[in-house]
Design a protein with these regions (language model features):
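C-terminal helical cap/extension that packs against the catalytic core
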Residues: 46-48, 341-401
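Residue-level signal for inorganic ion chemistry
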Residues: 27, 68, 112, 141, ...
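Short internal beta-strands
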Residues: 34-40, 215-219, 328-331, 351-361
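N-terminal leader/targeting and accessory segments in enzymes
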Residues: 1-93, 97
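Active-site regions of enzymes building and remodeling cell-envelope glycoconjugates
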Residues: 47-57, 88-89, 107, 178, ...
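Phosphate-binding loop of NTP-binding sites
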Residues: 60-61, 72-219, 223-232, 426-432
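Nucleotide phosphate-binding/pyrophosphate-handling subdomain across enzymes
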Residues: 2-10, 23-26, 30, 106, ...
């Protein structure tokens, strides 16, 4: 059922980030006269016909509100969200509203989620469909904001590819016609309140589908295999048996990216794309920034920027992608209580001469290394910041080898996000 919003519906938008701005703009285009913004400060660019209320004014913020649209980063446990629930005010998100409207219009929506791999997979799907001359639009975290294009897609009816974070799948009430789930491992536990709530939010992409829909899932992922089926749709596993395409000229590196390519073909082929279309994309697409991104040769060393790796499992995948080329590893960041044992095993098995660790989480990875192999722990060094890590790697790494920056942790309090962290790493490397 589509959420009804009329010109006189009292709608509050909570948060003024990228999606919040998009929601405010969309409400204005709808002609909604009762829209208000709830945020910590009044934005300087807020239109005068949009009322503003401080987020800490719980009573005033929700007074008379019939629908609350929240930004994806706002936790379900936020006092204002809890107050809205207690008052019986429906809460949704810009992405959920977009998927609802696409469904009502009978549009094909491919939703892509997963603890890692969703951005690359969504991009591969969109590029493969485009290679097959199938009208396509990519929206979400790596494309345009979904509500920014809702009128265009209803009018022109392309296949819609939307990348969905766990924050966005959490609010879905209607699932996409095709759901793609890449991997499942612990992430964002502070936001979701634990592993199982996080997994449940991720899998909501399938739980909200209908019987006529399709769920494409990675059969090599143990957490997904343990939980399948995830909803009423037809389930299509990928990853087992031979691939239906050639990866001979594939620019993306690593077994995980070959799995992403399999997922992309499964989804794109539903709409008529062929293996040859994917093969052409794989031969030309080098990958997205901050995802095992090759920065080139500096000081006789190849530098790889994998700032997207905010969990140990992602760093292990990056190590697997480069095999014996990596002789120096840089990792660490915010300590979220992750189990670093799998990453420590991956580092010890490669017998790397240089492991450089960043605070505050670096010591936790160091402890995991020491527990496995005291000699490996003795070779690891904890530095003060990223600049020191890059300088030390440039001095210690064997010439002709590869330096991998794959933090296995977020960087709260130091960088705004993984993009800013990756940009800083790139700048430091290019300044050597």
């Amino acid at each position: 059922m589509t959420t009804s919003i009329g010109t006189d519906t009292s709608v509050a938008v909570f948060g003024y980030g990228i999606e919040g701005r998009s929601a405010v703009s969309w409400l204005r285009r709808l002609g909604c006269r009762q829209a208000r913004l709830i945020s910590s400060e009044r934005p300087a660019d807020l239109e005068r016909n949009i009322a503003w209320i401080a987020a800490d004014d719980l009573d005033g913020a929700l007074s008379g509100v019939e629908l609350l649209i929240k930004s994806p980063g706002i936790k379900p446990s936020h006092p204002l969200i809890l107050a809205a629930m207690a008052a019986g005010i429906p809460t949704t998100s810009a992405t959920a509203l977009f998927v609802e409207r696409a469904d009502t219009a009978g549009l094909a929506v491919i939703g892509v989620t997963g603890s890692k791999g969703k951005s690359t997979t969504a991009t591969l799907i969109a590029k493969t469909l485009e290679a097959a001359s199938i009208p396509t639009v990519l929206v979400g975290n790596i494309g345009r904001c979904a509500l920014d294009v809702v009128e265009d897609v209803v009018s022109h009816r392309p296949v819609i590819v939307v990348e969905l974070s766990s924050y966005q799948t959490h609010d879905l009430t209607i699932g996409p016609s095709v759901a793609v789930i890449t991997r499942l491992f612990p992430e964002h536990l502070d936001w979701h309140g634990g592993i199982e709530p996080y997994y449940a939010s991720k899998l909501k992409i399938a739980a909200t589908q209908c019987e006529g829909d399709v769920t494409i899932w990675n059969a090599t992922d143990p957490e997904l295999a343990r939980r399948a089926p995830f909803g009423p749709a037809r389930h299509v596993p990928y990853g087992l048996g031979p691939a239906a395409f050639s990866d001979t000229h594939m620019k993306l590196r690593g077994p995980h990216n070959r799995l992403n390519a399999r997922a992309a073909l499964c989804a794109a082929s539903i709409f008529g794309a062929l293996p040859s279309h994917l093969e052409g994309v794989l031969a030309a697409f080098p990958g997205l920034p901050h995802r095992i991104e090759d920065l080139g040769i500096f000081c006789g060393l190849r530098w790889i920027n994998d700032s997207i790796a905010t969990a140990p499992e992602a760093a292990v995948a990056a190590l697997d992608a480069f095999g014996g080329e990596v002789k120096t590893y840089i990792g660490g960041g915010t300590d979220r209580g992750f189990d670093f044992a799998p990453l420590a095993r991956a580092l010890v098995s490669r017998d790397l001469p240089n492991v450089i660790l960043l605070p505050p989480g670096g010591p936790s990875l160091l402890a995991a290394l020491v527990a496995l192999d005291p000699k490996a722990g003795a070779r690891a060094r904890v530095v003060s910041d990223l600049a020191e890590a890059v300088a030390l790697a440039a001095r210690l790494a064997p010439r002709g080898s590869t330096v991998l920056f794959s933090p296995a942790s977020p960087s709260y309090g130091v960088f705004k996000n993984f993009e800013e962290r990756g940009d800083m790493f790139r700048m430091l490397v290019q300044g050597l």
